[in-house]
């Protein structure tokens, strides 16, 4: 682990320590990994509600005349599919079709788009957009201007309603409100596969919102949850994590994120390369693996058909919901691997039998 003094620190670290959190480095930040234990936090989120501090996530603002039009010419998804008050999953690609980052774009109005990239990639996204921005459009890095608090799980709406926060909104919609004189953006978004919300209060006022949420979450039978549970939850959903399922060398098509590309748009970063890859077909595809026997899968393991290597795992964990080892893996398309087929994974010299499945591993309940 990196020296804590060399890492960036969130606005709520003292509160997490008071709650007994254990910490680890993630994206250059010192973040809470668990409190009562990853499995307990995972199950609380699936069955009741979990509260996550994900303030390490980036924030950026694109503002100026035609800001939405500019962002639409740069990021992959088509902003014309949504409008003010809605959010959209999208990607910032390089010219070879690899992924600089995946992020959420919040459509404020035609002249203002708010972005939430991943922690480690915020500067790269801002730099890419600044380099292409037309006169009159500014791109600002607001990484430490806002905290991000995720309330996720079947009782998440009850938690927000208890506090008088807006909860009755469509998936991927958002609303700007005020809570105890603190401005808060409440978004119907998340990274767990459950009905949930992400709240963005100002960095310096995050404690007021966190304390109220923590009390309401506890009252609803939930608990604080760390990045360990966030990872097991997103892996069960098959959601990509940049640096694992997406990277400058892993394209959206390979990661099965082609749905987040506006193919009919005239311009976006990496368009020519991605159109060529779409025409030829990706050389590898992201698939799910579920262990047949006992054990845990991790990233970086070789996947084989017989004695022939056909791919590599990109993420792996033990699924608390399924009580089985699961993984995401990039599999060569010319290996002609099919869903339901058995493959083996080399787990430190042991051949582990796995079934190929199409994620998500458990039912999606976001809506």
UniProtKB/Swiss-Prot annotation:
Coiled coil: none annotated. The keyword Transferase applies. Signal peptide: none annotated. The keyword Isomerase does not apply. InterPro entries: GCS_T, GCS_T_bac, GCST_C, GCV_T_N, GcvT/YgfZ/DmdA, GcvT/YgfZ_C, TrmE/GcvT_dom1. Its EC number is 2.1.2.10. Keywords: Aminotransferase, Transferase. It catalyses: N(6)-[(R)-S(8)-aminomethyldihydrolipoyl]-L-lysyl-[protein] + (6S)-5,6,7,8-tetrahydrofolate = N(6)-[(R)-dihydrolipoyl]-L-lysyl-[protein] + (6R)-5,10-methylene-5,6,7,8-tetrahydrofolate + NH4(+). One of its GO terms (biological process) is glycine decarboxylation via glycine cleavage system. The glycine cleavage system catalyzes the degradation of glycine. The glycine cleavage system is composed of four proteins: P, T, L and H. Belongs to the GcvT family. HAMAP family: GcvT. This is Aminomethyltransferase. The gene is gcvT.
């Amino acid at each position: 682990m990196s020296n804590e003094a060399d890492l960036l620190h969130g606005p709520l670290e003292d509160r997490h320590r008071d709650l007994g959190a254990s910490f680890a480095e993630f994206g250059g930040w010192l973040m809470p990994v668990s409190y009562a234990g990853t499995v307990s936090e995972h199950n609380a989120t699936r069955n009741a509600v979990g509260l996550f501090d994900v303030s390490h996530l980036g924030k950026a603002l694109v503002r100026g005349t035609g800001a939405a039009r500019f962002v639409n010419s740069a990021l992959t998804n088509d902003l014309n599919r949504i409008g003010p008050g809605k959010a959209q999953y999208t990607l910032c690609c390089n010219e070879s079709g690899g992924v600089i980052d995946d992020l959420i774009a919040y459509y404020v109005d035609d002249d203002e788009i708010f972005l939430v990239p991943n922690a480690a990639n915020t500067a790269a996204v801002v730099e890419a957009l600044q380099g292409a921005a037309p006169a009159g459009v500014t791109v600002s890095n607001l990484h430490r201007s806002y905290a991000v608090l995720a309330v996720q799980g079947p009782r998440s709406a009850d938690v927000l309603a208890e506090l008088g926060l807006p909860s009755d909104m469509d998936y991927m919609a958002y609303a700007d409100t005020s809570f105890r004189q603190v401005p808060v953006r409440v978004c119907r978004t998340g990274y767990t596969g459950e009905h949930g919300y992400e709240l963005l209060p100002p960095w310096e006022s995050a404690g007021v919102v966190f304390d109220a949420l923590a009390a309401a979450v506890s009252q609803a039978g939930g608990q604080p949850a760390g990045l360990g549970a966030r990872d097991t939850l997103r892996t069960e959903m098959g959601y990509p994590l940049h640096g694992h399922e997406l990277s400058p060398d892993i394209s959206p098509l390979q990661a099965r994120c082609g749905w987040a590309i506006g193919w009919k748009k005239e311009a976006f970063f990496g368009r020519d390369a991605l159109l060529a890859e779409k025409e030829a077909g990706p050389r590898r595809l992201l698939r799910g693996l579920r262990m047949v026997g006992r054990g845990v899968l991790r990233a970086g393991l070789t996947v084989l058909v017989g004695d022939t290597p056909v791919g590599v795992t990109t993420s792996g964990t033990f699924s608390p919901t399924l009580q089985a080892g699961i993984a995401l893996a990039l599999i060569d398309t010319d290996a002609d691997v099919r869903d339901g087929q058995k493959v083996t994974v080399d787990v430190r010299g042991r051949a582990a039998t796995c079934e190929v499945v199409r994620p998500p591993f458990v039912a999606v309940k976001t809506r």
